[in-house]
Amino acid sequence: MSTIPGMLTAFLLIVCEPGAIGRLGRALADTEGVAEVYTTTGSADFIAVVRVADLDALATTVTQHIAELPGIVRTDTHLAIRSYGRGDEAAAFDIGVD
């Protein structure tokens, strides 16, 4: 996965209350800064990919928008520091001119 220059990418592992997955999926996806949301197997119920401009925006997104959603039990944030793959973001901005 590639990152967008000038943006921070973080991966949030999210644990929710039993029975909350159905309603939290859409709420997480609709949260500003959240680019993708997946339900998962394992210790986390969701993994959310967050892309924001800076650490202040990340802190606001995680602590004020995501962690405060009813049904969220715990979040664990992992900040991406380097990308090794080719992602769709570069192709999205390609206008086809060499």
Where do the protein language model's features map onto the residues?
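A compositional/biophysical signature of low hydrophobicity enriched in polar/charged and small residues
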Residues: 1-98
